[in-house]
């Protein structure tokens, strides 16, 4: 894990050959949806382990079948709220809950509109109560403009103030990180890798495309048929 010196509390994993290999597969346009989803699950699980390394531990005494010895517990691991941004973050959440099995889960459906406005539409929110002992992990694979995450994090604040607010993603653009840190300087950002920037449509470059479409298939738009009213 590498601390990026451009910002406070921003970390990437360029130093991990294992994660870089998974990311390479995700970037490849020929990777199918099954492999793509599995890759996201793996990254969520591994990055969850890395987050645990930053949590407080407490030494305890236990009895083995042979004698007394000393061990540890990670106290904060049981006070985690994972907020998933539908739909692309679902595999990330699957990986995270393998590490934080006691986590409470929040679900937010939020999507970004087209350039140049990039307006955010949020139409479903289910978030549990958040306490001052909680670590909130907001999972969203792509931190592009940061607009979606800022909207979600503003919503999260209505449910309480956590001990830690963590954003977990796969790829990030500097533009998105800048906007998040301006609005939420206390936020910690963990991403597999930070890419060079955005194109005119707000996509990360070199990126990996639309994570939701690649994980679950591109949605189709069904035309709305006119309603026919009959008169008895």
From Swiss-Prot:
Binds 1 Mg(2+) ion per subunit. The magnesium is bound as Mg-PRPP. CDD domains: PRTases_typeI. It catalyses: UMP + diphosphate = 5-phospho-alpha-D-ribose 1-diphosphate + uracil. The keyword GTP-binding applies. Uracil binds at residues 204, 209-211. Its EC number is 2.4.2.9. One of its GO terms (molecular function) is uracil phosphoribosyltransferase activity. Keywords: Allosteric enzyme, Glycosyltransferase, GTP-binding, Magnesium, Nucleotide-binding, Transferase. 5-phospho-alpha-D-ribose 1-diphosphate binds at residues 87, 112, 140-148, 210. GO terms for biological process: UMP salvage; uracil salvage. InterPro entries: PRibTrfase_dom (IPR000836), PRTase-like (IPR029057), Upp_A (IPR034331), Ura_phspho_trans (IPR005765). GTP binds at residues 38-42. Signal peptide: none annotated. It comes from the Archaea. Allosterically activated by GTP. Pathway: Pyrimidine metabolism; UMP biosynthesis via salvage pathway; UMP from uracil: step 1/1. NCBIfam families: PRK00129.1 (NF001097), upp (TIGR01091). Belongs to the UPRTase family. Catalyzes the conversion of uracil and 5-phospho-alpha-D-ribose 1-diphosphate (PRPP) to UMP and diphosphate. This is Uracil phosphoribosyltransferase.
């Amino acid at each position: 894990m590498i601390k990026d010196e451009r910002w406070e509390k921003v970390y990437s994993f360029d130093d991990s050959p294992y994660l870089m290999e998974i990311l390479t597969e995700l970037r490849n346009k020929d990777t199918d949806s099954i492999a793509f989803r599995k890759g996201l699950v793996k990254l969520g699980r591994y990055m969850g382990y890395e987050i645990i390394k930053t949590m407080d531990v407490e030494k305890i005494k236990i009895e083995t079948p042979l004698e007394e010895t000393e061990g540890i517990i990670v106290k904060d691991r049981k006070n985690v709220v994972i907020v998933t941004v539908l739909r692309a973050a679902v595999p990330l959440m699957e990986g995270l809950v393998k590490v934080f099995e006691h986590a409470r889960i929040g679900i937010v459906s939020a999507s970004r509109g087209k350039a140049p406005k990039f307006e955010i539409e949020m139409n479903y929110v289910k978030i549990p109560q958040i306490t001052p002992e909680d670590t909130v992990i907001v999972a969203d694979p792509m931190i592009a403009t940061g607009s979606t995450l800022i909207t979600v994090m503003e919503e999260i604040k209505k449910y309480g103030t956590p001990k830690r607010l963590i954003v977990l993603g796969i790829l990030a653009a500097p533009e998105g990180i800048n906007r998040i840190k301006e609005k939420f300087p206390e936020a910690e950002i963990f991403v597999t890798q930070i890419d060079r920037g955005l194109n005119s449509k707000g996509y990360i470059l070199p990126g990996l495309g639309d994570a939701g479409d690649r994980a679950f298939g591109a949605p189709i738009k069904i035309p709305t048929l006119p309603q026919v009213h009959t008169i008895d």
